[in-house]
Amino acid sequence: MSLYKPFLLFAGISGTGKTRFIREQVKKNPAQDNYCLVPVRPDWHEPSDLLGYTSRLGGKAEYIPTSVLIFIVKAWCHIIETIHQNEIDGEVNLDWEGKNLEQIAPFWLCLDEMNLAPVEQYFADYLSVLETRHWYTPSELAEYNKHEGAEYEYVYECDPLLKPDVLALLDDTARNKLAKQLGLDLSDGLQKEIWNYFCQHGIAIPFNLMVAGTVNMDETTHGFSRKVIDRALTFDFNEFFPNDFDAYFAPALQPKRLGYPTWSDGRAITDIPELEQHSKESVTFLKAVNGILQQSPFELAYRALNELMLALLAHRPANTAELVAIWDDFMMCKVLPRIEGDSDKLRSHQTAESDLLTDLEKVLAEQFAEHWEGTRPDLFNCKVAAAGEDSAPAEPPLVPCRSKKKLAWMKERLARQCFTSFWP
């Protein structure tokens, strides 16, 4: 199942299986070596802790890479099938061509205990470059193929995490040493061409890189700003993938495999006629939610609307129940994690006696209709085949609305402590 963001936060109490869940995602492709576990250190404070740095201790510039940068290069090598040359204004420009998407596995980078250090500091470069990813929409791709006389399945662009200017400061010896440290064999024709491409354009975020951070909220960890939350998909792990003691030995559900997104511009939904009505209803839904959040620090903007459209493109709802499930999960992953504060900060702007959480409950009850008090399809889990059955049932399991339970929990916490937040 494709997600609509490649950056995930798995929040929950210790021991729920967050790190193991991420490791399980790669079992479908065990030969790819497409999993990297990086324990975050409390003393990380700048992007060089994540991506490496330039050292001049030996008198000459030398780049010291990290396991994260090595893994990023490995993900790119899995994507790239060939490097070709184009001449633009007399200069040779290198460009890459990738394998078919079905041949490209996701590469999972697990940042364990991600908030032991201030995420806004050591993760700043990734958070900025993440917003530059661009997949061509079907109409853009058709125009591009027409102009180039090509038949590309996709075109993906992204700014570099490691800029070419940094590599240009290195002499040939230092560059060759770095290439070797990054796992590239310059005696191999394709890998040498990939390295030449990196030297010309820098090293960007590969589209198959899934970054997943495990999060515990206690006295030893740091909180998240809305800058981080807005760029991530946040999962309250035990709500999406609950620890059911009764099903420990014979689970009835299993999590779906998660894949990388292949969309970045929600306006691509206009190229999908069967999603037209759902997109209009989703805009109405988000406007209703934002009507409650206006005049508060939690008001939503274009990024939220774009990502709701991307959620429709990723899940392709077949009916109203699945559409409500997308809305419910969107509230859990994108809206409620942004909301925190005391009674004054969460005061309703509609009535003096109410609060923002109560107002949200009323809007969601209206928008979700009968599903608010009933159930909705679970988009992230599937049923396990029972003993004696050849295959699992095709219909998705049904679960209560997750945002209803979370809002009730946040309201109870606000009443008890005069402060609340999304985080368990």
Descriptions of predicted regions:
Residues 1-424:
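C-terminal regulatory/interaction module of P-loop NTP-utilizing enzymes
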